[in-house]
Curated annotation (Swiss-Prot):
Biological source species: Nautilia profundicola (strain ATCC BAA-1463 / DSM 18972 / AmH)
Chain's role: This protein is one of the early assembly proteins of the 50S ribosomal subunit, although it is not seen to bind rRNA by itself. It is important during the early stages of 50S assembly.
GO biological process: negative regulation of translation; translation
Official protein name in the record: Large ribosomal subunit protein uL13
CDD domains: Ribosomal_L13
Gene: rplM
Subunit text: Part of the 50S ribosomal subunit.
Protein family according to the UniProt entry: Belongs to the universal ribosomal protein uL13 family.
Molecular function GO terms recorded: mRNA binding; structural constituent of ribosome
InterPro entries: Ribosomal_uL13, Ribosomal_uL13_bac-type, Ribosomal_uL13_sf
Amino acid sequence: MKFTKSIREEDVKRDWILIDAKDKVFGRIITEIATILRGKHKPYYTPHVDCGDYVVVINADKVKFSTSKKLEDKYYKHTGYFGNLKEETVEKLLNNNPEKLFKLATRGMLPKTKLGRKMLKKLKVYAGENHPHTAQVKGN
């Protein structure tokens, strides 16, 4: 009888992957990022182990949206006080803080546990071309 062997946290080899978001569709990039952060692209994927890679996204402010989602989609937060439900449109987030927009969208595709929060810490988003991770990213 054969058994499937689960990988341990110590045995995971992590890479740094650079994604250029310029003129790419937002939802498709987020899906790709979430897959890489979870480690589902690796042959030894194990759901209860963080086996994903680091992701560096550049040109986050130059991403494209299909249809009119830029104006229609909203992100909500609540301050804790009565009647203080705050909403921000995607367009406003993209103009003011594209890093936050990418983190919020990716967080929605990751597990809502300690493991998901740990995975999200491996996402690095930058609005421009420059980033401080040139030493880690292969091919740069």
